């Protein structure tokens, strides 16, 4: 039902309008591309890509922004608002917030050095948010490989390449120390660091995230090319330099079927880019609202007045 040319007649400028906002925002905020990609991911894992993550709390539901995986970390909402405002001027009541977030993710990846792909479009926006589901459906940075696979399979992403390629979104962006500290000092209650951590990387991370330090300090996922979308993430995993446990598990879980994919993507950028684009399309197609389902929100933060 979704198709890349969905807006070719009704809003042909949609891609340019979204791109111009991202280009402008990147000048002052080099993190914004990674932040937008993460918003899309956190949207799609909770009842499909329906822009439910963008809704603020109302009298009928609590916002997903308050859920543990999003609170104090999901960001970029104001940038989506900028895109929506510009699109409402150019093509009123035409482009859904769900499609804005999907297109913005693709352009964010492309502008950061990553692949391009034709984004299937025609999603509509949900009229409710799913706070409880956001707390349970999103993968945790402390997950083992088995838990990660289950979280992905639960939403319909059941190929090893879905998990390994989408994890490569951590080739840019940052995480807070509070998601890393346990690995550095007391991994799984052992009073020792995670044995998969490269010793020099461990020393670097301990400097950035001291034992009783400020958990809100931000650390780059990829120390080599922190704002570039490339395959360095996988090389880092092979060298024991994955920042969060759930990423390192892809390579360090003995006998895992994800290891050959980490090796492949590390040695071949085109293989990674192709797999990432494919997995993004698969994720973007999860349970979309189409036709007369949902609505086209006029303000991405609130449901249209009835």
From Swiss-Prot:
- GO biological process, alphabetically ordered: hydrogen peroxide catabolic process; response to oxidative stress
Q: Which GO terms describe its molecular function?
A: heme binding; lactoperoxidase activity; metal ion binding
What cofactor(s) does the depicted protein rely on? Ca(2+); heme b
UniProt keyword annotation of Oxidoreductase present: yes
Give the Enzyme Commission number.
1.11.1.7
| Residue numbers of Pyrrolidone carboxylic acid PTMs | 1
Q: Which Cys residues form disulphide pairs? A: 11-91, 44-49, 97-300, 177-209
Q: What class of enzyme is it?
A: oxidoreductase
Q: By its UniProt entry, which InterPro entries does this protein fall under? A: Haem_peroxidase, Haem_peroxidase_sf, Peroxidase_pln, Peroxidases_AS, Peroxidases_heam-ligand_BS, Secretory_peroxidase
Superkingdom, natural source: Eukaryota
Q: Which reaction does it catalyse?
A: 2 a phenolic donor + H2O2 = 2 a phenolic radical donor + 2 H2O
Q: Which CDD domains match?
A: secretory_peroxidase
Function according to Swiss-Prot or TrEMBL: Removal of H(2)O(2), oxidation of toxic reductants, biosynthesis and degradation of lignin, suberization, auxin catabolism, response to environmental stresses such as wounding, pathogen attack and oxidative stress. These functions might be dependent on each isozyme/isoform in each plant tissue.
Family, according to the entry, reads as follows: Belongs to the peroxidase family. Classical plant (class III) peroxidase subfamily.
Record's protein name: Peroxidase E5
Q: Which organism is it from?
A: Armoracia rusticana
């Amino acid at each position: 039902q979704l198709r890349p040319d969905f807006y070719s007649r009704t809003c042909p400028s949609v891609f340019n309008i979204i791109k111009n906002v991202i280009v402008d925002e990147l000048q002052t905020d080099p993190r914004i591309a990674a932040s937008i990609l993460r918003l899309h991911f956190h949207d799609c894992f909770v009842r499909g890509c329906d822009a439910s993550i963008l809704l603020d709390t109302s009298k009928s539901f609590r916002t997903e922004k308050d859920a543990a995986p999003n609170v104090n970390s999901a960001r970029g909402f104001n940038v989506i608002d900028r895109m929506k405002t510009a699109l409402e001027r150019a093509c009123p009541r035409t482009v859904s917030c769900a499609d804005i977030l999907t297109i913005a993710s693709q352009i964010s990846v492309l502008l950061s050095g990553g692949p391009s792909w034709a984004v299937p479009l025609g999603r509509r926006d949900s009229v409710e948010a799913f706070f409880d589901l956001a707390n349970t459906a999103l993968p945790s940075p402390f997950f083992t490989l088995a838990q990660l696979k289950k979280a992905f399979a639960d939403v319909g992403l059941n190929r090893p390449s879905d998990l390994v390629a989408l994890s490569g979104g951590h080739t840019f962006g940052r995480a807070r120390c509070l998601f890393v500290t346990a690995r550095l000092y007391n991994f799984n209650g052992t009073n020792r660091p995670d044995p998969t951590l490269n010793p020099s990387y461990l020393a670097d991370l301990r400097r950035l995230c001291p034992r009783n330090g400020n958990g809100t300090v931000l650390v780059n996922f990829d120390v080599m090319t922190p704002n570039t979308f490339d395959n360095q993430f996988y090389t880092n995993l092979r060298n024991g330099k994955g920042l969060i446990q759930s990423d390192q598990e892809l390579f360090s879980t003995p006998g895992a079927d994800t290891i050959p994919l980490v090796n492949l993507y590390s040695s071949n950028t085109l293989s990674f880019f192709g797999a990432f684009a494919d997995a993004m399309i698969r994720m973007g197609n999860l349970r979309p609202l189409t036709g007369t389902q949902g609505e086209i929100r006029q303000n991405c933060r609130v449901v249209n007045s009835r």
